[in-house]
């Protein structure tokens, strides 16, 4: 099993963890139905960029 040569400081630990934060999802409002959805994803009723792309 690998063992570190020396203890990592709180600063190094924090710098490593700086990329672990969870960011909130970006939401958009569909121009046709006014429904809120995730960016670059179709809405629950099958619209994407105001065009019906899938029959639901």
Curated annotation (Swiss-Prot):
GO terms for cellular component: large ribosomal subunit. One of its GO terms (biological process) is translation. Residues 1-16 have a biased composition (Basic residues). This is Large ribosomal subunit protein bL32. Residues 1-38 are annotated as: Disordered. Belongs to the bacterial ribosomal protein bL32 family. HAMAP family: Ribosomal_bL32. InterPro entries: Ribosomal_bL32 (IPR002677), Ribosomal_bL32_bact (IPR044957), Ribosomal_zn-bd (IPR011332). Keywords: Ribonucleoprotein, Ribosomal protein. GO terms for molecular function: structural constituent of ribosome.
């Amino acid at each position: 099993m690998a063992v570190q040569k020396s203890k990592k400081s709180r600063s190094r630990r924090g710098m490593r963890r700086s990329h672990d934060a969870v960011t909130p999802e970006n939401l958009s409002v569909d121009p046709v139905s006014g429904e809120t959805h995730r960016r670059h994803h179709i809405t629950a009723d099958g619209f994407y960029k105001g065009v019906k792309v899938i029959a639901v």
